[in-house]
Amino acid sequence: MAEQLALVIGCIIGGLLLLIGISCCLWKRLCTTFTYEELPETADTATSSSFSKKEERPCRYAGIPSVRLPSVPFVVPPSHQGRDWVRLHGGDWAVAPQDPCPVPEHITCTSSPAAGQTSLPLCVMGSINPELYKSSEDVSEAGFPDGCLGRLWFSVEYQQESERLLVDLIKAQHLQVPAETCSTLVKLHLLPDKRRFLQSKAKRKTCNPQFDESFIFQVSSKSVAQRVLKFSVYHINKQRKHQLLGQVLFPLKNETLAGDRHRVIWRDLEAENLEPLSEFGDLQFCLSYNDYLSRLTVVVLRAKGLQLQEDRGVVSVFVKVSLMNHNKFVKCKRTSAVLGSVNPVYNETFSFKADANELDTASLSLVVLQITEGDKSYPLGRVVVGPYMYTRGKELEHWNEMLRKPKELVKRWHALCRPMEP
């Protein structure tokens, strides 16, 4: 009985092994009937047309007569290894000739200590991967306006937990240097602190310097929204003296700090205003009128030299913009308040509905006010722009230039006049 049982088990095992062997043979024969072809790096017309001229291959299956099937071209995508890379005009790299899209080169981030400034920390942040940085405007490297002093690219991020402001200084272009050779550096201030600053490394023999440096400012979360980041671009002359080429003022507002650090920001350089301050300070703003939309736009940029009333308590300043018609109030809007600065920066835009036939009797009143104790406001200065009926001098010129240049932002400084007592 035991011998019969062993014989049955042996037969079963032998049968299973035989079936496995037959299955393996059939699988191998089936796999050999298909061929895979990899296209060369550069596919030409002759190669692509050769598929139609391939001879038919026999396909045999077990127990089935030979059947001749046309070959099916299977394409393996070519790899990018071995491609030629060419350098573009803007300093980027691209694959030639198959891939015309530029691929940015990887940049190294370095540390640049400020001379004699130990209280503001500066450290190496690692390599900057340009693919992570998204430019907010597509025309950032084109369309330099007439009289442009240069353009600066940077990014900012505020880390709430560690109370650190991270600034990436990326590059500058189209710098206007009063010399044959250009050697530039950038100083970074966190206003209103003008004494301490951080400084980049000097870039020599180029008007389009690539900095790729990271800086850290330690600043409280309570005051960071009131701060202004200032970039000052200098040219180093033969006497090793620093000559200012232009500056960028970037307010650190909440909506700015909440953005993505990898979003690249660019700003055009502005010349330093060397005109003497007025008695009550000065206000800079832009005017624009869109006749198609019947929209009057005011951009409040900054003020300087304000005469703050320290004895009235809290020192924070805002600007109230009012649209008047026949000296009657129509509508008003106000900027956010900036704390503790006689040179506040706003960069806020307001729009008013105004028909073209109303511009001869309309005017704009901009009043700078200081917030005092009890949420009361005290006027520091005032300026009115409008037609000949209400204004003269620079204020009238600004209004007329706005009308001559529709849909364009016309920017000017204006001296504040004596405020009206509340």
UniProtKB/Swiss-Prot annotation:
<dbReference type="GO" id="GO:0017158">
    <property type="term" value="P:regulation of calcium ion-dependent exocytosis"/>
</dbReference>
<dbReference type="InterPro" id="IPR035892">
    <property type="entry name" value="C2_domain_sf"/>
</dbReference>
<feature type="topological domain" description="Extracellular">
    <location>
        <begin position="1"/>
        <end position="4"/>
    </location>
</feature>
<feature type="topological domain" description="Cytoplasmic">
    <location>
        <begin position="28"/>
        <end position="422"/>
    </location>
</feature>
<feature type="domain" description="C2 2">
    <location>
        <begin position="279"/>
        <end position="400"/>
    </location>
</feature>
<keyword id="KW-1133">Transmembrane helix</keyword>
<dbReference type="GO" id="GO:0005886">
    <property type="term" value="C:plasma membrane"/>
</dbReference>
<keyword id="KW-0677">Repeat</keyword>
<dbReference type="GO" id="GO:0016192">
    <property type="term" value="P:vesicle-mediated transport"/>
</dbReference>
<dbReference type="InterPro" id="IPR000008">
    <property type="entry name" value="C2_dom"/>
</dbReference>
<comment type="function">
    <text>May be involved in the trafficking and exocytosis of secretory vesicles in non-neuronal tissues.</text>
</comment>
<comment type="subunit">
    <text>Homodimer.</text>
</comment>
<feature type="domain" description="C2 1">
    <location>
        <begin position="148"/>
        <end position="267"/>
    </location>
</feature>
<dbReference type="GO" id="GO:0016020">
    <property type="term" value="C:membrane"/>
</dbReference>
<dbReference type="InterPro" id="IPR047897">
    <property type="entry name" value="Synaptotagmin-15/17_C2A"/>
</dbReference>
<keyword id="KW-0472">Membrane</keyword>
<dbReference type="GO" id="GO:0005544">
    <property type="term" value="F:calcium-dependent phospholipid binding"/>
</dbReference>
<dbReference type="GO" id="GO:0070382">
    <property type="term" value="C:exocytic vesicle"/>
</dbReference>
<dbReference type="GO" id="GO:0061891">
    <property type="term" value="F:calcium ion sensor activity"/>
</dbReference>
<feature type="transmembrane region" description="Helical; Signal-anchor for type III membrane protein">
    <location>
        <begin position="5"/>
        <end position="27"/>
    </location>
</feature>
<dbReference type="Pfam" id="PF00168">
    <property type="entry name" value="C2"/>
</dbReference>
<protein>
    <recommendedName>
        <fullName>Synaptotagmin-15</fullName>
    </recommendedName>
</protein>
<dbReference type="GO" id="GO:0000149">
    <property type="term" value="F:SNARE binding"/>
</dbReference>
<comment type="similarity">
    <text>Belongs to the synaptotagmin family.</text>
</comment>
<keyword id="KW-0735">Signal-anchor</keyword>
<keyword id="KW-0812">Transmembrane</keyword>
